[in-house]
Swiss-Prot record:
MF-aspect GO terms: L-ascorbic acid binding; metal ion binding; phytanoyl-CoA dioxygenase activity
Role summary: Converts phytanoyl-CoA to 2-hydroxyphytanoyl-CoA.
Family listed: Belongs to the PhyH family.
EC number: 1.14.11.18
Name the record gives this protein: Phytanoyl-CoA dioxygenase 1
Broad EC category: oxidoreductase
Organism: Oryza sativa subsp. japonica (Rice)
InterPro entries in UniProt: Phytyl_CoA_dOase-like
Binding annotation for 2-oxoglutarate: 98, 137, 152-154, 169, 239, 248
Length: 281
C-alpha cells in the first residue's frame, strides 16, 4: 500500500481548484496518542516562563523571545489565560496557546512524524524538489479561552521567491465548528498574495492593510483526529475562538521548497542553520 501522502490525480485536481485538501486517517491513533502524550510531558516540564500569543496584536514579534523561538521549543500562553492580578486563571496545561517553532527538529516524537514517509510522499506528489519544514507548532485551542486566528495567508509570514509555502494541519483531536475548526475560502489561493509581514532590525510591520472578507464565503473544515488538512500558502483561512468545554489539539507544519526558491530575509523567522530537507531529488 502506498504511503497516505501519495496523492491521486483527483486529489491533486481538488487541491489545485480549492487550495486545500483533507486527507482522512493520515496518522494512526497510535501516532496521534504518541504526539499528545509527548506534548503533555513537555508541558509538565515547562517552568511557566513564556509569552502571550495573539494573531490580532503583533507587538509580540518585537519580542526577542518570539524571534528566538524559530530554532527552539518555546511556549506561548493564551491571551485570556491570565486574570487581572497577572496570575493564571486555570491550570498551566489549560493555559498554553501553542508550542513552537522547532518541534520537528528538536523533539524525536515530532521529528518522526515530520520526516516520515507520509509527509515526504505528500510533497513528492506536489512536485517539491527539496522540501524542508520551516516551522512547526503544537496548537491547543484551549476550552473556553482558545483564541481566534484571524483570516490570513501563510505566505504572508513565510515568504519565498517564488512563493512555495504549504501548510499541513494534523488534527490530534476532532475539530468541529463548536470547538474551533479551520474555515477557508475555497479557491481564494488563485487571487494571489494580499500582503506580507516585514521584519526590520527592531520591529515588524505589514506592507498593506488587512483585507476584509465576507464570512459567508468561508466553509468549515471539520475533521476527525488523525485527519490532515493540506493548505496552499495563498489560501485565506481562519479559526474562531473556542468557547466550548472541549479542546482542539492540532499539529501544524509549514513546508517550503529550498531548491529554486529563495527564503526572504524580510521574514520574521530567520535561522542560523539552514533547515534539513525531507528529501533531495
Amino acid at each position: 500500500m502506498p504511503p497516505a501522502g501519495s496523492l491521486t490525480d483527483e486529489q491533486l485536481r481538488f487541491f489545485d481548484a480549492n487550495g486545500y485538501l483533507v486527507l482522512g486517517s493520515f496518522s494512526s491513533a497510535e501516532e496521534v496518542r504518541a504526539m499528545r502524550d509527548r506534548m503533555a510531558e513537555l508541558v509538565d516540564g515547562f517552568d511557566g516562563a513564556g509569552d502571550v500569543f495573539s494573531t490580532k496584536d503583533h507587538r509580540q514579534v518585537k519580542n526577542d523571545f518570539f524571534f528566538k523561538s524559530a530554532e527552539n521549543i518555546s511556549f506561548f500562553f493564551e491571551e485570556k489565560a491570565f486574570g487581572d492580578d497577572g496570575c493564571l486563571k486555570q491550570a498551566k496545561e489549560l493555559s498554553i496557546n501553542k508550542v513552537g517553532h522547532a518541534l520537528h527538529e528538536l523533539d524525536p516524537v515530532f521529528k518522526k512524524f515530520s520526516f516520515g514517509a507520509n509527509v515526504s510522499s505528500l510533497f513528492s506528489s506536489l512536485r517539491y524538489k527539496r522540501p524542508a519544514v520551516i516551522q512547526s507548532m503544537y496548537i491547543f485551542k484551549q476550552p473556553g479561552i482558545g483564541g481566534e486566528v484571524v483570516p490570513h495567508q501563510d505566505n504572508t509570514f513565510l515568504y519565498t521567491d517564488p512563493p512555495s509555502c504549504t501548510g499541513l494541519w494534523l488534527a490530534l483531536e476532532d475539530a468541529t465548528k463548536t470547538n474551533g475548526c479551520l474555515w477557508a475560502i475555497p479557491g481564494s489561493h488563485k487571487n494571489g498574495l494580499k500582503r506580507r509581514m516585514i521584519r526590520d532590525e527592531i520591529d515588524t510591520h505589514f506592507d498593506h492593510p488587512s483585507p476584509t472578507y465576507d464570512l459567508k464565503e468561508f466553509v468549515p473544515l471539520e475533521v476527525k483526529s488523525g485527519d490532515l488538512v493540506v493548505i496552499h500558502g495563498d489560501l485565506i483561512h481562519q479559526s474562531f475562538e473556542n468557547l466550548s468545554p472541549v479542546s482542539r489539539h492540532a499539529l501544524s507544519l509549514h513546508v517550503i521548497d529550498t531548491e529554486g526558491c529563495e527564503w526572504s530575509k524580510q521574514n520574521w523567522l530567520q535561522r542560523k542553520i539552514p533547515p534539513q530537507p525531507l528529501y533531495e531529488n
